[in-house]
Amino acid sequence: MDSRDTGETDQSKYKGIRRRKWGKWVSEIRVPGTRQRLWLGSFSTAEGAAVAHDVAFYCLHRPSSLDDESFNFPHLLTTSLASNISPKSIQKAASDAGMAVDAGFHGAVSGSGGCEERSSMANMEEEDKLSISVYDYLEDDLV
């Protein structure tokens, strides 16, 4: 049965992501002041794609606070991200953060007998911030 038959839509409640017709969630973001887009990746869950978008948005726009409504999961971000990092480093950090979230969902779903992804996101929100660091992806001359 198609999701359109059940009344569900492929539109997400998260910012900066979309769903492909075959079910994967993707995220990309425009680099401010340019026509360039950063491809952040293809993810199994909407939450993974949303976290990737959040990391890239934060690195590119450097908002003054994490209370900005531009974020999907502001509580998962760390404010200790470096400034002046390359778009490629931002892309890698965002993609890895999204994949880490996806991996957490797959572990929670497969280990719990098929519980809903939303409940695993609730568990994730109770844990500490993402353990991934943008510093892991900085080019040596920027550190």
Curated annotation (Swiss-Prot):
DNA-binding region: 13-74
Compartments in which it is found: Nucleus
Pfam families: AP2
GO biological process: ethylene-activated signaling pathway
Signal peptide limits: none
Keywords of the record: Activator, DNA-binding, Ethylene signaling pathway, Nucleus, Transcription, Transcription regulation
Domain of life of the source: Eukaryota
GO cellular component annotations of the record: nucleus
Alphabetized GO MF terms: DNA binding; DNA-binding transcription factor activity
Similarity comment: family membership: Belongs to the AP2/ERF transcription factor family. ERF subfamily.
Job of this protein: Probably acts as a transcriptional activator. Binds to the GCC-box pathogenesis-related promoter element. May be involved in the regulation of gene expression by stress factors and by components of stress signal transduction pathways.
Stated name of the protein: Ethylene-responsive transcription factor ERF020
Organism: Arabidopsis thaliana
